[in-house]
Amino acid sequence: MALDAKRMFDNLKVATIASDPDFKITYINKRGEEVFKAVMNAENLLGTDMRGCHKPETNEKLNDLFQEYREKKRNLDYYVMDVPGGKATIVNVPFYDGDEFAGVVEFIFESALG
């Protein structure tokens, strides 16, 4: 039985957020919505600029990271951050349409969020 990719990502218990090369959020699964509501009291993120979900001081790093992905100098990025009740590991992976940078998928692996 084949499961299409959208249904697979929709049902992951890992927050999954995709953005285009201009930082616009193009996909967020249910767990992603729950995490952003719990951590940032943020809702309706689809179509918004993902940099709004990050601290202002990290936006320069995001700009640099996306540029490195465009130039294919990096194939992923990750970091660990404190969240209420524990830690979360955030993993960013670029994706391409042929040779052209098409965006980033971000996975948030939680150690304690419910």
PLM region descriptions:
Residues M1-K30, K37:
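Sensory modules in modular signal-transduction proteins
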Residues N11-K13, G86-T89:
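Short, small/polar residue-rich loop motifs at catalytic or cofactor-binding pockets
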Residues E33-E34, R51:
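Sensory helix hotspots in PAS and closely related PAS-like folds
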Residues P56-L76:
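Soluble sensory domains of the PAS superfamily and closely related sensory modules
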Residues F95-G114:
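Sensory coupling linkers of modular signal transduction proteins
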